[in-house]
């Protein structure tokens, strides 16, 4: 039994091509990251000092109960999670997060309207329950009347 040997020249050529593509991809990633870093620096400069201070205070308040070890572990976990992501993915994630925060602020108004809807539903449910309770009450009254008739019949039988 002879086994076929893979053509090593073809395999080497494929490996070289793959390495070239990987290198090209790394260069593209680095270029995009550099562009993003420049844009981020520009965006940070546009924030007012009040906004920066508010963000810092919010972060401090959030982390004040945590130990330095916990904070470091959180940072490392975040880095490991984002290590394999492309700059485009990270940018998309950031934009999604910003949109979510914006919708939260706008959502507070919507929540008030939702609460009104819940109140209306509760009122309706309560009314429905009252009607059900009335039905039960009517049924109980009928049962009591039936018992009264039964007692009357029993008395008549005793008299006889």
Swiss-Prot record:
Biased composition (Basic residues): 32-42
Location of the region described as Disordered in the Swiss-Prot/TrEMBL record: 1-160
Record keywords, A-Z: Coiled coil
Coiled-coil region(s): 20-111
Protein name (database record): Putative uncharacterized protein DDB_G0292636
Source organism, top-level taxon: Eukaryota
Residue ranges with Basic and acidic residues bias: 1-31, 43-160
